[in-house]
C-alpha cells in the first residue's frame, strides 16, 4: 500500500530533479497531462471528470518545485520537533476536542480498537485538529510532482488515484486540497491511502476527510488498524535504566525488562506482557523509551522517528500524562543529513550497514550503529553523533 512514507522516500529523489524538468514550459506540462487521459479512462474516470479536474491548471506550481529543492537536506533534531509538535497550546486544544467529541471517539474505539488520545495526537500533528489541513490544490500539486519526476511512477499513480476519488464524488476539485506533496485533508492521506483506508463514519455517503471530524478520526483509526495496531498495548513508555544496564540486550519481553530493573519514569508499573525494544533518540543521558510494535505502526503513517515519538508523547499528554522526565542532549551533539550519509557510508564499508545512503536516521541506521558500538565495546545506544563518526573514520584510516 502507498502511504505518506512514500512521500518521505520520494522527496529525496525529487531533490535531484533536473533543471529542465523544474522549469519546463506550459506546453510540455499540458502534454504530460493529456498523456494521462488513457490511463485515467481505464480506471473509470470520465472525460468530464478529467477535464474538470485540470480546468485552470495551465502549468506546474513553482512553490511546489521550490519545496522539493528545500526538502533534501532538512534534518531536524527530535527535541526541536517535539517542542512544536507537543506544545502546551496543542495539549489544551486537544483536550478540548477530546471532551467535545467524546461520544464519537468512543464509538470509533469500539469499532477499530484505537484509543482516543492516539487518534487526537495524530489529528493534532497532521492538521492541528482540522484547523490547518493545507490549502494547496491537490491535483495541481500532484501533476507538478508527477511531471517533474517523469521517470518515476509514484506521483503519477497518486494523481490517477486522485482522479478516481473525484470520479467517485467524495469531493470536488475545488475542495480537494492539502499539502504541497499531495497529502490531503485533515488526516494528510495520499490519494492511494484514501482509496484503501478512508471511511464514511457519519453515513452521509462521502468519505470526507476535508470537513468531517468523524470521518477524519475514523479514517485514521481504520488506517492504524490496517497497519496492525494492537489494542492490548501502548505505543511505548519513557523509562529509567539502572546503573550499568546492558544496552546490547535492547529487545526483549517487557517483563524481562522489568526484571532487569527498567522502570517507568511516571512511577506506574510496566505491563506484564508483550515485546518491546529500547529507543534512545538522544543517546545515553537523554530520555529513554521502551517502544512496542505500535510505535512501528505509527511509523507506517509517517516513517520519521521524531514523528512517531511526538504522536506517542502527545497522546500521553492528552491523556493526562506528565512531560518527559529526562533532559535532551546539548545542541550540536548530533549529525545532520550530510553527516548521516557519511556515517552510513563508513558503516557500510565496515559491514555494519546495508541500505540506502540517504542521510536519513531510522531503525536501519540505528541497528547498524548498535552493531558497531557492540563490536567496539561502546554503550549500544544506537545514537549517531559526530564523535562516533570521527571514531569510525580514525580507525578505518579514512580521515584525510
What is the predicted role of each segment?
Residues 4-8:
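N-terminal export leaders
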Residues 9-15:
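Bacterial N-terminal signal peptides
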Residues 19-23:
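Boundary at the C-terminal end of the N-terminal hydrophobic targeting segment
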Residues 28-51:
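Mature N-terminal segment immediately following signal peptide/propeptide cleavage
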Residues 45-273, 287-289, 298-337, 359, ...:
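Catalytic glycan-binding domains that act on GlcNAc-containing polysaccharides
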Residues 335-340, 345-392:
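Short acidic, glycine/serine/threonine-rich helix-capping segments at coil-helix boundaries
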Residues 392-400:
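Intrinsically disordered, low-complexity Ser/Thr-rich linker and spacer segments
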